[in-house]
Amino acid sequence: MIEVVAVKAILVSKSGPLQAMRKQEWTQRFATASNRITTLADVNDRPIGVFDSGFGGLTVARALIDLLPNEHLVYYGDTARYPYGPRSLDEVRGFARQISEWLINDVGVKAIVIACNTASAAALTELQAECHVPVIGVIEPGVRSAIEATSQGRVGVIGTVTTIASGAYQRAFAAADPGVELVCAACPGFVEFVERGDTDSDQALVLAERLLAPVLDAKVDSLLLGCTHYPFLARTISRVMGRDVTLVSSADETAFAVRRALIDGTIPARIAATPGERRWLSSGDASRFQQIGEQLLGIGLTAVEHHDCS
């Protein structure tokens, strides 16, 4: 039986130099957007914006829908520019800024959830400083849950090349519990398998056996899935790691973090008791996004729209 543990906090991460625009210019753009949308609709009734490089963030979106069924939600999958993993932090930071500006300016979201570990590692700190709506990410929740899940103090983290190289997880674990023995492994190729809807094939298993060797050899007892795509590969990953290793995902507790922000007023909660509306967008092929998204989630998606934020 595969055990995927929910996690408990909001991601914090650090990032490198600013890209393209100076920080104050981005801050002004976000401020202008925020001022515009405040007059367009009641703040409480505005949607929560969620974005990822593609399908991975759907794990977070599903958790939000299950936990907060009355909240409106807008999901943006940047499939035209996926995968983010091999790209530089500066480039990913630029993408995150473009998407966030569009979500605030044109969509009018009241909060943003960065449902992508690579984008969180690259841009969370900057977006929290620049945006005039709350911005929540997905790293620190997983860190805390992985620490809670380990009984021997040996924790593995798998993620994209850029996420692992950023040091975001290493810093977060060092801050949370310096005594944890941490083994990190980049898993290039995992995201592409998920984006193709191939999560349980022999080819996926062969790749997993090769990429997971460092954490398997280290005999970790808790493995943090440091990419929101990876829960879709949980069955394959568990076949390699074995039943004694607890897989940790941040989707559920990221949703709990949003709920806490709604309860304490950080994010204005929707008052109406009617079910929230869902809107799904992709920068790539909208029909393919709908097909693969429904296959991965096991639920129907309303008509997926195409939108290019670049």
Q: What residues fall within each predicted segment?
A:
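Non-catalytic structural scaffold of enzyme domains
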Residues: 30-310
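Intrinsic disorder/low-complexity segments enriched in small, polar and charged residues
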Residues: 14-15
